[in-house]
Amino acid sequence: MKKVYLLLLTMFLILGTNESMAQSKKYSVYGVGFYNLENLFDTCHDAGKNDYEYLPDGTNKWTGLKYTHKLRNMSRVLSEMGTDKLPKIGCAAIGVSEVENAKCLEDLCNQEPLKARNFQFVHIEGPDQRGVDCALLYNPALFKVRDYKLVPYIYRLPQDSMRATRGFLVVSGTMADEHVTIIVCHLPSRGATSFYREEGGAQIKVVKDSLIADDPNVKLLVMGDMNDDPQDASMAKCLGAKRKIKDVGDGDMYNPWWDVLASGTGTLMYDGAWNLFDQIILSPSLLNRDNSKDYSTLKLFSHQIFRRDYLFQKEGKYKGNTLRTQAGGVWLDGYSDHLPTVVYLIKEQK
């Protein structure tokens, strides 16, 4: 099976536009994505969690039928992510947020589109009061997990001493025979002030700096629902995620989504305007900062917002918005209020 995947991953690309440069080379391409699943809850109460609205007798009347449909819809999207460039293969790894527990992830990975690729998951139960966590789904033929941990989000203000929220899931593994680490996060919502997201950005930077200090060559991706746009202080200042590759210093990161938002599109819509909260941010080790086309090690090749017609409302007041699972107390049998994002990493085959 592994040989089949590696064969399918081979791409023949022409680098450069000059005839003198037009040499066919062999490359392996890997998709890495992120998707906010928007409340993937099962129908059972988790002790100590405020999940009552997602019970059969809760405000959302969350029945087995609705849960089954949610699993089907999420697996469809997840299985299609990355297939624009990697047909029938999709992503090697996908970070997800707003999932209740390991049972939901097990049920999700047992859906046929994901089960066919033997998708596995990494999850650690977190302290969020609603019970929503982050996780990493991965195809073990393309990404091999070494170890993982959950780094807590730390509330520093005295008045927040009793609060707890989602931490930062850090997963280290091997992709293309290289050390790759993925940090999956879901920063505090916009119901809180920007201070808490700025704290989150600064805390991610501490984790990131520690990982790079341990291995300066690690290929590191920070991904998640940041509840902020690329230009906001949590990302641009506190995390140090730059808009242009030429401005990325050794201690910085690169945020390719800044220009995507500036072009007029995003991953979720609010009051008729796009935001781009769902970001995948890359360490300098994944960049060709000298404008070369050196792909002897894993490098960023391209990035995209994953869009399909079925992810959008087709009519009514909210035409053009994402088709949610439910809205205004009405079950829409949709997907999520967010769109997924994908980056493609490329490496020359020797």
Spell out what each predicted region is:
Residues 21-112, 122-134, 202, 308, ...:
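N-terminal, active-site-proximal structural segment of metallo-dependent hydrolase catalytic domains
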Residues 1-27:
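Bacterial Sec-dependent N-terminal signal peptides
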Residues 22-24, 209-220, 228-350:
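Metal-dependent phosphoester-hydrolase catalytic domains
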